[in-house]
A protein has these predicted regions:
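Glycine-rich phosphate/diphosphate-binding loops that line cofactor/substrate pockets in enzymes
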Residues: 5-17, 56-62, 86, 144-148, ...
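Active-site diphosphate/adenylate-binding microenvironment
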Residues: 7, 22-35, 336-423
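Thiamine diphosphate
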Residues: 95, 104-105, 109-110, 255-258, ...
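Glycine-rich, acidic loop regions that bind phosphate or pyrophosphate groups
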Residues: 96-137, 159, 231-335, 510, ...
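Conformationally flexible catalytic loops at phosphate/diphosphate-handling active centers
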Residues: 140, 144-195, 344-345
């Protein structure tokens, strides 16, 4: 079996049926293998788009996303996508071609050390030099990708290795049962939560990647401890559930009243204000659960750290709970969340021109429907979206949540989300600046019959940065953009395009775009 076929056959054995890629000579043997193994290759227009689409695919399906690029600039163009996935804790496997081993370091075409470039932004990076060892390297990469806190991995595949021939076997990987918390730590956690008057749960990305949706619901319904969700865990407990307060934007009033917080699968980074104000007072006691011990102590040390898989630990906590449910506090917390929700929802009503940004977000929510996958990207546009976009099921709201503050992810995310869930409506709300990064992936969507609706907030500027520039300095510059007719880009590839300049027309226009099926 040729090396390219080995790669494809091994991936097929792990259940992979779609990959994202940008072609080049050094990686072509893998594409041939994908054809033979029945793996769909969704070819993008930029390598960053391929990796980001793979991450979105992972965040919708809960399974690793796979991407391929060629050697040299193929690798360098993919680095930001890797950094986003790794910082976000998303399992993404990028493989690239490489110059044949005999031509390394000769100044030949597209020869660059992909391993050295990608190591700083991945959990693991390496190069395979022997066709017979391809399965071993693939297995190592996969285990590193999904083991502990998930992340991005990279494997470099020299051209002569991919064209080599070997007799190998492939099979699905088997994994050990994930660990739970120690009995002593578990008992302490149950005591702290049971004695608390105003406990809260914050569920982060680790809860999603552990597959803890059922376990989170069971724990919440038994204990009646209110839950807020963030990042990849949005929708893990649906917004609107009796025990779910929703996103952090609506949970703030309850959080600052809490005396004990159970933090599930998230670090104290910017997404939770580093464990300090305005979401935390410093007086609450923290119980932090994470599969990755190095997550403990970042910016704030918890009173109790439980090392274990979130899904397993939640089952342990539910089984061990013997305190009274926190019904009264849950009602109070829920009411505070509803107050915040009403305040944010009030911003979605407006009229006239220019169109208020809240009106755009509100129209997206109403027209997309409860089963849609919503995506936001940009500065100002994303800020409005995170306060108004709901999540009624896991994987239904995607936005960049890495500490890099990366913009330009939206169009590739929409592409990957639609590939992951072809039967669901996908709507992207994006700023005009961010749209420019991935605009040509509209051609990818059209070519692969992956329709989604992109709603562009077009203010002719890098708005968020321009606001800050104007606040700090006496003049603004380098933050202006043309107020382009971006709808014509969609039309150029056979899609539906419409320009809207009045608030009253936003909802109907979004409806027409969705109904067009383009």
């Amino acid at each position: 079996m040729l090396g390219g076929r080995i790669v494809a056959a091994w991936l097929k054995a792990q259940g992979v049926d779609k990959v994202f890629a940008l072609s080049g000579e050094h990686i072509l043997p893998v594409f041939d293998g994908c054809v033979e193994e029945g793996i769909e290759v969704i070819a993008t227009r930029h390598e960053q788009g391929a990796v980001l689409a793979a991450e979105a695919y992972a965040r919708v399906t809960g399974r690793p996303g796979i991407a391929f690029v060629t050697a040299g600039p193929g690798v360098t163009n993919a680095v930001t996508g890797l950094a986003v996935a790794n910082t976000s804790g998303s399992p993404v496997f990028l493989m690239s071609g490489r110059t044949s081993t005999k031509k390394r370091l000769t100044g030949t075409f597209q020869d660059i050390d992909g391993r050295a470039i990608t190591e700083p932004v991945t959990k693991w990076a390496d190069t395979v030099f022997d066709v017979e060892r391809i399965p071993t390297y693939l297995e190592t990469a996969w285990r590193r990708m999904v083991g502990g806190r998930p992340g991005a991995v990279f494997l470099e595949l020299p051209h002569d290795v991919l064209k080599g021939d070997a007799e190998v076997s492939v099979a699905p990987l088997r994994f050990a049962e994930p660990p739970g918390a120690s009995p002593g730590a578990l008992a302490t956690a149950l005591k702290m939560l049971g004695e608390a008057e105003r406990p809260m749960v914050i569920a982060g990305g680790g809860a999603f990647w552990s597959g803890a949706a059922d376990e989170l619901r069971a724990f919440a319904e038994r204990t009646m401890i209110p839950v807020a969700t963030l990042n990849a865990a949005r929708g893990l407990l649906p917004d609107g559930h009796d025990v779910c307060i929703g996103p952090m934007a609506e949970a703030g009033l309850a959080l600052i009243q809490s005396d004990v917080m159970l933090i599930l699968g998230t670090k104290f980074d910017a997404s939770v204000t580093f464990g300090g104000p305005p979401l935390f007072t410093g007086n609450e006691k923290i119980i932090q659960v994470d599969i990755e011990p190095t997550s403990f102590g970042l910016n704030r040390m918890p009173e109790l750290a439980l090392t274990g898989d979130v899904r397993v630990v939640l089952t342990q906590l539910t089984d061990g709970w013997d305190a009274k449910p926190k019904d009264e506090w849950c009602r109070t917390a829920k009411e505070s969340g509803q107050q915040m929700h009403a305040a944010w929802e009030a911003t979605t009503v407006g009229e006239g021109s220019p169109v208020p940004p809240g009106v755009v977000c509100g129209a997206v929510v109403r027209e997309a429907g409860r089963d849609a996958i919503l995506i936001s990207d940009g500065g100002d546009s994303h800020t409005w979206a995170i306060t108004t976009f709901p999540a009624f099921r896991q994987g239904s709201y995607l936005a960049t949540h890495d500490s890099l503050g990366t913009i330009g992810v939206g169009v590739p995310y929409a592409l990957g989300a639609k590939a992951a869930a072809p039967d669901r409506t996908v709507v992207l709300c994006i700023g005009d600046g961010s749209f420019g990064f991935g605009a040509l992936e509209l051609e990818t969507a059209a070519r692969n019959n992956l329709p989604f609706t992109a709603v562009i907030m077009n203010n002719g500027s890098w708005g968020n940065i321009r606001h800050e520039q104007g606040r700090q300095f006496s003049q603004t510059n380098a933050t202006e953009l043309s107020v382009g007719d971006y709808e014509k880009i969609a039309e150029a590839f056979g899609g539906y395009g419409e320009r809207v300049d009045d608030a009253a027309n936003v909802g109907p226009a979004i409806r027409r775009a969705i109904d067009s099926g383009k």
